[in-house]
Amino acid sequence: MDSLNNNTAVANEPKWLRIANLLFRYAAAATALWHLIKAFVGVGTPYVFRATHLSIFLFLTFSLFLIESLKARQKVRSAIYAIFTTLAIAMLVYFQLAGERLTMRIPIIGDVYPIDIFFAIFTALAILVAIKRKIGWPMVIICVVLVLYTRYGYLVPGYLNHKGYSWSRLLDVMFMGIEGIFGSTINVTSRYIILFVLFGCLLSKIGASDFINNFANCLVGTSRGGPAKVSAVSSALFGMISGAPTANVVTTGAFTIPMMKKSGYSDVFSGAVEAVASAGGAITPPIMGSTVFLVSEILGLQYSEIASRCILCAVLYYVALLWMIDLEAQRKGLLGTPREQLPRFREAVKGAYVFVIPFGILVYMMIAGYTTTMAGLAG
């Protein structure tokens, strides 16, 4: 029924919107392919690669914003996002033409051209606009305050006082090297996170979420408070291949929350269990959340070493969650799901090799000491 409704909604869309969505998907697919090729053949000049990565994703981000605003008939926002989308394309071209010059440029004393200043300002502004749209004002305010502190640190009293950077030096550090905007964060997202996100999306698209839900039902579905325990187990398993709490909620929550409510849990408790269970995916090896890649980059530790030390944390996290669910089920007198309503174990694990083999390859390569990029690419 949902598939039929989705097909009907797509058929009722204006032709221009269908074309725009199709072009966006092609652009996203090309971006994924480009990252896979770069992971295989090498990234080349780090500065140019990171700048290209950021330019492409700014283009995709504002293209999506533009499509959404056009669909909502918001003329002013559409015009603004159209400008940002166009400038993101110009930014991509700029880095292809000027990337080598900026790479070879001597910091602080090298020449700075007006076009460099223009794209430096645009890059910072575009990032702030995207952050405001997806996260909100608090993160934007934090970024702006930190930039102002870097510039006017001499006005701050006490231990936080420093001489301050001039605007020209601030521009040099933040935009014209691999220490600012194009520093460790962009390095991690462009080389590691993108590959693991693609890996998780691929497994999800070929039916991993259905397998996980059925497998979790077979494991704990009949136990006391079974539906809520299924939510915890399925979120833990999905977190192993995704690591993204939001994707975890969307994928497993659509199935487990209605099941929990139907079995007798309150709306608040059902939502809380799914939120907590999905958040735990960020600390569940081997993929975990994006933060672990930054930790690995900053501390200089192997990703596999960090992941192995998080196993106990993840186990304790989900054991505590299952214990809490069991206590709530005991308090309310809730039983598990009748076995005849659950999928059979043989049916649940049928075709599991499609997910287990690539996942096993990923885990093996990380344990064997291969680089994170190679492990993600092989998976």
Tell me the role of every PLM-derived stretch.
Residues 44-48, 72-77, 103-198, 347-348, ...:
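Hydrophobic transmembrane alpha-helices of multi-pass solute/ion transporters
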Residues 296-312:
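Helix-coil boundary and interhelical linker segments in multi-pass alpha-helical membrane proteins
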Residues 25-38, 57-66, 86-95, 122-131, ...:
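Hydrophobic core segments of alpha-helical transmembrane domains in multi-pass membrane transport
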Residues 93-98, 249, 262, 281-293, ...:
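Transmembrane-helix bundle segments that line or gate the permeation/cavity pathway
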Residues 113-118, 180-192, 218-231, 263-269, ...:
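Membrane-interfacial loop-to-helix junctions in multi-pass transporters
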Residues 1-111, 117-121:
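Conserved, well-structured core domains of diverse proteins
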Residues 213-281, 300:
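Hydrophobic transmembrane alpha-helices that form the pore/transport pathway of multi-pass ion
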Residues 2-22, 28, 308-379:
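Long, contiguous bundles of hydrophobic transmembrane helices that form the permeation core
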